[in-house]
Amino acid sequence: MQLSLAPRVRVERPRFAWIAIALQVVTGVLAVPVGIMFIADPSGALMGLPPGWIEATPFGSYLVPGVYLAGVNGIGMLAVAVLGVRRHWSAPWLTGALGVGLITWILVQILIMPETMILTWVFLATGFALGFVALFWLRRTGQLRLW
């Protein structure tokens, strides 16, 4: 068995898919260093966050959020952006999955953290944008037939 990022069948990449690719690159580039900082210092002090914010949550520290942030919202977004550029058949599906993941991540953050910042709402909108682009991308390529 051989794994390859090269698609067997290149899917159409409509112009609007570049919106998702750009959002994935920006999100990934911003998420990786923050995730690494949370992993390096799970108290959040390195990021200037009060320890009381996370101690009262089910996580107890920023370690698990840091791993998710660096792995899924960081490396995952960058990897799927590459798949989108390469017109891999899975790119629209994974774009949708990461959009839903980002929405979930932000909603959990809104529910458990005592304060939000403008980036919270920007990334919530980014998650919805990824989801909608994925939906129309799948529709355009014929991989999803809803209407």
Predicted regions and their residues:
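Topology signature of small-to-medium multi-pass alpha-helical membrane proteins
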Residues: Q2-W147
